[in-house]
Regions:
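Basic/polar N-terminal segments that are highly enriched at the extreme N-terminus
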Residues: 1-9
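A short, structure-level motif marking secondary-structure boundaries and short turns
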Residues: 2-3, 32-35, 149-150
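Acidic/His- and Gly-rich active-site-bordering loop/insert found
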Residues: 8-94
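Acidic/histidine-rich catalytic neighborhood of metal-dependent amide-processing enzymes
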Residues: 90, 100-205
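Short Gly/Pro-enriched turn/cap motifs at secondary-structure boundaries
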Residues: 207-211
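Conserved small/polar residues in nucleotide/adenosyl-binding loops
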Residues: 215-216
Length: 216
């Protein structure tokens, strides 16, 4: 990408997007219950697709419902830069867990459009399937990366006995793309802090340098 001044984003637009997305599965106390492959998840996918297409993106879905929105570059054959997260939530989830990573990525694409900037590499925003894992054991990102078996995932059931593949089909989320055939130059995920440190120290953003594993 050529050097440009800092790219201004439209914070009000990003906020409005969160508020609108947050209405899908909204709970009385301000949270969100938008579990993977439910009617609410289907609505969220449709809304993201609508916004991404309005921003000029090519939107595609793979065979486990991972949703990809790509803004093409001068050289579309170069491996893309990818960012994103997930739109599904826990039963008692929040508006910003996961959704922020998807909508922040979308806002970058919108801001690039506003500034008339053409990038050297395509930029792709992804919404992974079932990242919270409240209904099914396998996440879309693990399947994409080849870390889980597709047939086992398809046959996995939620607590009510619904198969993963059947749930995909029921909300028309099973796409034609094979798993993993999308080379990336780099991948980033923006995520809300799930702890007190940044807020306590007065920082607006932090960079993750490692994982901490919790044992319950």
């Amino acid at each position: 990408m050529r050097n440009h001044p800092s790219l201004p984003i439209d914070a009000d637009r990003l906020w409005r997007s969160h508020e609108e997305m947050g209405q899908l599965g909204a709970t009385p106390k301000g949270g969100v219950n938008r579990q993977a492959l439910t009617a609410q998840d289907q609505q969220a996918r449709a809304l993201f697709t609508q916004w991404a297409q309005a921003a000029g993106c090519i939107v595609e879905t793979d065979c486990v419902g991972n949703l990809f929105a790509r803004r093409l570059a001068r050289d579309p054959d170069l491996p893309a830069v990818c960012t994103g997260s997930h739109l599904d939530t826990q039963p008692t989830g929040g508006k910003y867990d996961g959704a922020y990573g998807v909508l922040a990525g979308l806002e970058i694409l919108r801001a690039l459009n506003d500034a008339g900037i053409e990038t050297e590499r395509s930029i792709e925003v992804v919404a992974w399937t079932n990242e919270e894992g409240t209904r099914f054991a396998h996440s879309g990102s693990a399947l994409f990366a080849g870390k889980a078996d597709l047939e086992q995932a398809y046959n996995a059931t939620d607590p009510t006995g619904i198969r993963f593949e059947d749930a995909l089909t029921a909300i028309e989320a099973k796409g034609p793309l094979p798993l993993g055939n999308r080379p990336y130059d780099s991948l980033f995920e923006a995520h809300i802090e799930q702890g007190p440190i940044l807020e306590r120290e007065g920082y607006s953003v932090g960079i993750v340098t490692g994982d901490r594993k919790s044992v319950v």
